[in-house]
Amino acid sequence: MSDNNRIVELTHSLSEVLDRKLSEIKAVTGTTRILALNALIEATRAGEAGKGFAVVAAEVKQVSETINAITKSLEVELNEVVKELTNLTADMAHSE
């Protein structure tokens, strides 16, 4: 196996690891969003005493949404890298 093939395979393996990590981040983000919603509900039920907590819950929800948007963007970029690696692998196979 040539050095180029090893590099492509290693890069592809790393992209799979990154994809799994992005999935984990998405799962945590979803859980965080649910926790923020539950916290907001409880803050609302607490009335005046829960107003400060409602602000914190809203901020946590916003952070979760921001992380979700970043994760989606990274997924798009990672998919593009995988596509290019697939094309490169096919080109290398044809040139051998």
Language model segments and positions:
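Alpha-helical coiled-coil heptad-repeat segments
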Residues: 1, 92-96
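Short, low-complexity N-terminal regulatory "tails/caps" that precede and couple sensory modules
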Residues: 1-2, 9
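Parallel, heptad-repeat alpha-helical coiled-coil signal-transduction segments
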Residues: 9-16, 20-31, 44-87
